[in-house]
Swiss-Prot record:
Primary role: Allows the formation of correctly charged Asn-tRNA(Asn) or Gln-tRNA(Gln) through the transamidation of misacylated Asp-tRNA(Asn) or Glu-tRNA(Gln) in organisms which lack either or both of asparaginyl-tRNA or glutaminyl-tRNA synthetases. The reaction takes place in the presence of glutamine and ATP through an activated phospho-Asp-tRNA(Asn) or phospho-Glu-tRNA(Gln).
GO terms, molecular function: asparaginyl-tRNA synthase (glutamine-hydrolyzing) activity; ATP binding; glutaminyl-tRNA synthase (glutamine-hydrolyzing) activity
Oligomeric form and interacting partners: Heterotrimer of A, B and C subunits.
Cross-referenced InterPro entries: Asn/Gln-tRNA_amidoTrfase_suB/E (IPR017959), Asn/Gln-tRNA_Trfase_suB/E_cat (IPR006075), Asn/Gln_amidotransferase (IPR018027), Asn/Gln_tRNA_amidoTrase-B-like (IPR003789), GatB (IPR004413), GatB_C_1 (IPR042114), GatB_Yqey_C_2 (IPR023168), Gln-tRNA_amidoTrfase_suB_CS (IPR017958)
Reactions the enzyme catalyzes: L-glutamyl-tRNA(Gln) + L-glutamine + ATP + H2O = L-glutaminyl-tRNA(Gln) + L-glutamate + ADP + phosphate + H(+); L-aspartyl-tRNA(Asn) + L-glutamine + ATP + H2O = L-asparaginyl-tRNA(Asn) + L-glutamate + ADP + phosphate + 2 H(+)
Organism: Prochlorococcus marinus (strain AS9601)
E.C. designation(s): 6.3.5.-
Protein name: Aspartyl/glutamyl-tRNA(Asn/Gln) amidotransferase subunit B
Gene3D superfamilies attached to this UniProt entry: 1.10.10.410, GatB domain, N-terminal subdomain
Signal peptide per UniProt: none
Enzyme class: ligase
SUPFAM superfamilies associated with the record: GatB/YqeY motif (SSF89095), Glutamine synthetase/guanido kinase (SSF55931)
The family this protein is said to belong to: Belongs to the GatB/GatE family. GatB subfamily.
Length: 490
């Protein structure tokens, strides 16, 4: 067995975020996903002679906003370069990217790490750079998930030329859990900004992981290995954990780690070698002669900075420090901006924050999951949820009744007060209405009454249940318990 504790993992992530602009980065071709292959291409995408790329201004805006949200220093001057390599999914035989003068450098992102049976902590992960580039096309392999072993391959250039932001972290990550949480926080951030949907299944967010191991925090870095083909956050964590253990085992058995690219095999839960890793010199970068330099003034940066929303980390802090929520609930609510906004508007409409949190994270999220809906598809208004919560607090309805009417409120988005009045569901809160029913129950169950008086006090629950059955759950629970105790002990 490997002695994992004597080793330290060193991990960095390269995260590719596909920007959700309507047109591609250097042409007006559509970025629509899921259409027939090769229907969103044009002479610029294909690199035909005589065509010239023109930068999409929205791409620059989205990239700068992402940089500012990640605490990066945005350059006032940057340029595009040609990254040259030959592969079937690259129609021009080069990719327009940024090399030595990226859009932004030297930022950071704070990530909350919560693991079972461990103390939660905040990890500050450095970000080396963010640069803009165009995406490549997509290869479809017949009879295999990769080129090797396939009968033939087809190329779909619909994705080619879609705008990407590549976010390169510093090697500050030390575990698979930290890697997956960092990637998750990147996705959360770009979704809040509205610059990407971050959908890993559709390729809108893709992560490559660079991993090495060393003997303790002061030892020199080991040889790094790049891992690709991780399509979920859990896959990122599992791939990192596997590769860390693999490298340690190789070293402890006297072997050598090669600088290579490996693929994560989800079915077999392991990494396997793909190719030796290229260096940057292999790509023969040089400035793109068809694209001029980009100037981004401080004044323009300030305008875009003021347009940034409140980001997830600030919301989590606010929910815990001001609203009194648990760290877990704060994290669940802040995960989606639509959920966070709904929660805050519910509180703004008079609902107590912890009660609003409970209803949002439990009952509403549960309903949406069971009906395969996203939070952005929720029809219920924050005003109506706040009204229902306040009706519970004022003993107008019971929590049980509230749970029963919630699906109808969600489906129709009608006033809870109006619905309760129409269905006669208001709580019975006066003694004169409850006492006669209790008297009937006592007369009908003399044996249970005597057993209660003889010390079987758990029978109180039996009488409460019978009372709720008679009143269809509308009796005030506190008043019901009080009156039952008085009458059973008399």
């Amino acid at each position: 067995m490997n002695n994992l504790e004597s080793w330290e993992a060193v991990i960095g992530l390269e995260t590719h975020v596909q920007l959700n602009t309507k047109s591609k980065i250097f042409t007006s071709a559509s970025t629509a996903f899921g259409d027939a292959p090769n229907t969103h291409i044009d002479p610029v995408v294909c690199g035909l002679p005589g065509t010239l790329p023109v930068l999409n201004e929205t791409v620059l805006e989205y990239a700068v906003k992402t940089s500012l949200a990640l605490n990066l220093n945005v350059a006032e001057h940057c340029k595009f370069d040609r990254k040259q390599y030959f592969y079937p999914d690259l129609p021009k035989n080069y990719q327009i990217s940024q090399f030595d003068e990226p859009l932004a450098e030297n930022g950071w992102l704070e990530v909350e790490i919560i693991e079972k049976d461990k103390e939660p902590y905040i990890k500050k992960i450095g970000i080396e750079r963010l640069h803009m580039e165009e995406d490549a096309g997509k290869l479809v392999h017949s009879g295999s998930d990769r080129l090797a072993g396939s009968k033939y391959s087809l190329v779909d250039y619909n994705r080619a030329g879609i705008a990407l932001c590549e976010i390169v972290s510093k090697p500050d990550i030390r575990s698979g859990k930290e890697a997956s949480e960092y990637a998750s926080e990147i996705r959360r951030t770009v979704r809040y900004l509205g610059v990407s949907d971050g959908n890993m299944q559709e390729g809108s967010l893709r992560c490559d992981v660079n991993i090495s191991v060393r003997k303790g925090p002061n030892a020199p870095f080991g040889t790094k290995v790049e891992i690709k083909n991780m399509n979920s956050f859990s896959a990122i964590q599992k791939a990192c954990d596997y590769e860390i253990a693999r490298q340690i085992e190789v070293y402890e058995n006297g072997g050598k780690i090669f600088q290579e690219t490996r693929l994560w095999d989800e079915a077999k839960q392991l990494t396997k070698s793909m190719r030796l890793k290229e260096g940057s010199s292999d790509y023969r970068y040089f400035p793109d002669p068809d694209l001029g330099p980009i100037e981004i003034t401080k004044a323009q940066q300030e305008i875009w900075f003021k347009e940034l929303p409140e980001l997830p980390s600030k919301k989590r802090y606010k929910y815990v420090s001001q609203f009194g929520l648990s760290a877990y609930d704060a994290r669940v609510i802040s995960d989606e901006i639509s959920m966070a906004n709904f929660f805050e508007e519910t509180v703004a409409n008079g609902a107590e924050a912890k009660l609003a949190s409970n209803w949002v994270t439990s009952d509403i999220v549960g309903y949406l999951k069971s009906n395969k809906l996203s939070f952005s598809e929720l029809k219920l208004s924050p005003e109506n949820l706040a009204e229902m919560i306040n009706m519970i607090s004022k003993n107008i309805i019971s929590g049980k009744i509230a749970k029963e009417i919630l699906p109808e409120l969600i489906q129709k988005n009608i006033s809870p007060k109006k619905l309760v009045e129409e269905k006669g569901l208001a709580m019975i809160s006066d003694s004169s209405s409850i006492s006669p029913i209790i008297d009937e129950l006592i007369n009908e169950h003399p044996n249970e009454v005597q057993a209660f008086k003889n010390g079987k006090t758990k029978l109180l629950g039996f009488f409460v249940g019978q009372l709720m059955k008679r009143t269809k759950g509308k009796a005030d629970p506190k008043l019901a318990n009080k009156l039952l105790m008085e009458k059973l002990n008399s």
